[in-house]
């Protein structure tokens, strides 16, 4: 396993010596390292300061250079040595390398738990199930992995892992995502910012960065001695120079719910505004968490239909393939079905919830219908009527001077032609 924290390296050494965690802390005291000192390096990749570092190095029986290499880093000040000795280093690595590429012809086919005309759902570990997917076979991947917060995601399915164990697992399935993506395919990773900082550093060496999207997390709980956590992060990367599909997404102008007046004053520019709405930015404040039981399909966390509709319509066209390695309640698959996308789904936990959801789509059709009441409109009908009532301008006042989209928008703004399976 790869190591990403000093704590995990120390713990691994203790395991090799047969120590319990309590015994490990007792032994470390002999090296002037107390429990509090070591725990400070449990959930990060920071290397300790001199006093603590010297004690840890003595316990591990290694130098600082060896410790940094153990963490997968080129030690500071030795970059030139590495660059000037790449051939020798490569020979050492190649002689040690015994990893074999997946040979799909020799892999036993796994039967899907459930399938429709558009997609297949598999029940099991995503790392095993990825082996069923050939190289460069998927147009878009959306992944909402466990956040490693010691939460229960399904009956008997929790996500507590060590710092290094979590990142090591994370990078393995990310590599599989990259393998199965088509050239120009899109990868979206939904997680808390802490983990996406590590992931973005890794992905920047493998894919083309497009956006770090901030998704407003409303009504979260405060954490002591920290800033109030108010967002999730959605990483958006592309395999290759540019996405093979990018459909412009537009949202309504922000208005007061009581009078309909716009929140921001656009002054003399209002007649130049696109009647299809405001171009979507990388801050999404209109995605509300699914918390009410009437909108949920299970008692655990669930993603918004609006979120998945936006991601899927932005990065795919009808008939394209969408993959989600952590199916959860099945929102990705339900939205893919309604948008006419093919899909591949993995889920380690209870797949029966997803199966029933896909067989009974009435609730999701209603939710998606509400999304499209506002999508690609400067003012939804209810807001437009409120503004007219209060004598405020509406886009119809300027439509004759604004012939639809601009030339640049027409090329990729085809969301009006999306065929929704809402009947």
From Swiss-Prot:
Enzyme class: transferase
UniProt-recorded name of the protein: Type II methyltransferase M.BamHI
Phylogenetic placement of the source organism: Bacteria, Bacillati, Bacillota, Bacilli, Bacillales
Coiled-coil zones: none
EC number, UniProt record: 2.1.1.113
Family matches, as Pfam families: N6_N4_Mtase
Domain of life: Bacteria
Gene behind this protein: bamHIM
Keywords: DNA-binding, Methyltransferase, Restriction system, S-adenosyl-L-methionine, Transferase
InterPro entries hit by this protein: DNA_methylase_N4/N6, DNA_methylase_N6_adenine_CS, N4/N6-MTase_EcoPI_Mod-like, SAM-dependent_MTases_sf
Temperature characteristics of this protein: The protein is very stable, after 18 months at -20 degrees Celsius it retains 90% of its activity.
GO biological process, one term: DNA restriction-modification system
Catalytic activity: a 2'-deoxycytidine in DNA + S-adenosyl-L-methionine = an N(4)-methyl-2'-deoxycytidine in DNA + S-adenosyl-L-homocysteine + H(+)
Miscellaneous comment in the UniProt entry for this protein: The protein sequnce was determined following expression in E.coli.
Annotated organism of origin: Bacillus amyloliquefaciens (Bacillus velezensis)
């Amino acid at each position: 396993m790869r190591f990403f924290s000093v704590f995990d390296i120390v713990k691994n050494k203790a395991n090799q010596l047969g120590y319990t965690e309590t015994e490990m802390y007792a032994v470390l005291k002999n090296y002037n390292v107390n429990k509090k000192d070591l725990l400070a390096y449990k959930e990060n990749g920071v290397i300790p300061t001199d006093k603590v570092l010297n004690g840890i190095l003595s316990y591990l029986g290694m130098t600082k250079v060896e410790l940094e290499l153990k963490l997968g880093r080129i030690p500071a000040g030795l970059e030139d040595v590495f660059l000037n000795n790449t051939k020798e280093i490569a020979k050492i690595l190649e002689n040690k390398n015994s990893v074999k590429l997946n040979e799909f012809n020799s892999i036993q086919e796994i039967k899907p738990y459930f399938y429709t005309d558009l997609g297949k759902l598999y029940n099991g570990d995503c790392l095993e199930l990825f082996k069923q997917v050939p190289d460069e076979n998927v147009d878009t991947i959306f992944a909402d992995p466990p956040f490693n917060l010691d939460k229960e995601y399904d009956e008997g399915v929790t996500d507590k892992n060590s710092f290094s164990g979590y990142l090591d697992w994370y990078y393995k399935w990310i590599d599989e995502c990259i393998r199965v993506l088509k050239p120009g395919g899109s990868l979206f990773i939904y997680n808390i910012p802490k983990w996406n900082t590590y992931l973005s550093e890794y992905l920047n060496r493998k894919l083309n960065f497009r956006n770090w999207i901030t998704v407003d997390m409303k009504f979260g709980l405060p954490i002591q001695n920290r800033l109030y956590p108010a967002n999730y992060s959605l990483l958006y990367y592309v395999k290759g120079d540019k996405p093979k599909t990018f459909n412009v997404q537009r949202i309504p102008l922000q208005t007061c719910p009581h009078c309909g007046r716009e929140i921001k004053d656009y002054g003399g520019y209002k007649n130049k505004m696109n009647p299809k709405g405001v171009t979507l930015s990388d801050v999404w404040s209109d995605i509300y968490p699914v918390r009410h039981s009437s909108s949920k399909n299970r008692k655990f966390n669930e993603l918004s239909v609006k979120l998945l509709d936006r991601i899927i319509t932005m990065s795919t066209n009808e008939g394209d393939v969408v993959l989600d390695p952590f199916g959860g309640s099945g929102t990705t698959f339900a939205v893919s079905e309604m948008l006419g996308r093919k899909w591949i789904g993995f889920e380690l936990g209870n797949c029966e919830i997803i199966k029933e959801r896909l067989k009974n789509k009435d609730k999701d059709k209603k939710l998606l219908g509400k999304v499209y009441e506002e999508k690609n409109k400067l003012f939804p009908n209810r807001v437009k009527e409120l503004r007219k009532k209060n004598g405020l301008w509406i886009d119809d006042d300027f439509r004759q001077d604004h012939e639809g989209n601009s030339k640049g928008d027409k090329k990729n703004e085809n969301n009006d032609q999306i065929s929704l399976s809402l009947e």
